[in-house]
Amino acid sequence: MADFTNNALKKFKLVFLGEQSVGKTSIITRFMYDSFDNTYQATIGIDFLSKTMYLEDRTIRLQLWDTAGQERFRSLIPSYIRDSSVAVVVYDITNANSFHQTTKWVDDVRNERGCDVIIVLVGNKTDLADKRQVSTEDGEKKARDLNVMFIETSAKAGYNVKQLFRKIATALPGIVQEETPEQPNIVIMNPPKDAEESQGRQCPC
């Protein structure tokens, strides 16, 4: 087992973007607490949580910024995108409009961060397959067109949520600064050796 006590702790800011009620908060809640709240409550403004991940070769601290999808909060979002390491753009597979709007969200990220950001396109609510309006193939195609990473999840069922964060962890750059590790909210993960997902860092600009 790796000795994590000597590993540096690097903080990475992840901002979650997307239309209202696509499941941004639910994905974060599933990752943080392995739970799901059936009672919908819209995020007001911006929420913040953080979690330590012990990886195979390093320890990182993920700062998770949950943004509101409502139009009245849109003016707040660019300032949170500006210093982010990762943008997680979420849509609801049962809502075609939320999928179409992801192009705008990705554009917003690139306008603020250029190519210096990892972007992940996430199709959520795969547990509602009988109501699906957006195929997996359409999601994969859009991700290729936008040159971003892609995954489908179900925050309700817990499907692929840990895998989402593994993909992100694999794509993140190496440790460059040392800090004292924080102990609360720890999750241990061994990302796959296959690091091809890191192509999400590339940008056609």
Curated annotation (Swiss-Prot):
GTP binds at residues 18-25, 43, 66-70, 124-127. Keywords: Cell membrane, Cell projection, Cytoplasmic vesicle, Golgi apparatus, GTP-binding, Lipoprotein, Membrane, Methylation, Nucleotide-binding, Prenylation, Protein transport, Transport. The keyword Cell division does not apply. It is a lipid-anchor. The modification Cysteine methyl ester is found at residue 205. It comes from the Eukaryota. GO terms for biological process: cortical granule exocytosis; cuticle development; intra-Golgi vesicle-mediated transport; intracellular protein transport; retrograde transport, endosome to Golgi; retrograde vesicle-mediated transport, Golgi to endoplasmic reticulum. This is Ras-related protein rab-6.1. It comes from Caenorhabditis elegans. The lineage of its organism: Eukaryota, Metazoa, Ecdysozoa, Nematoda, Chromadorea.
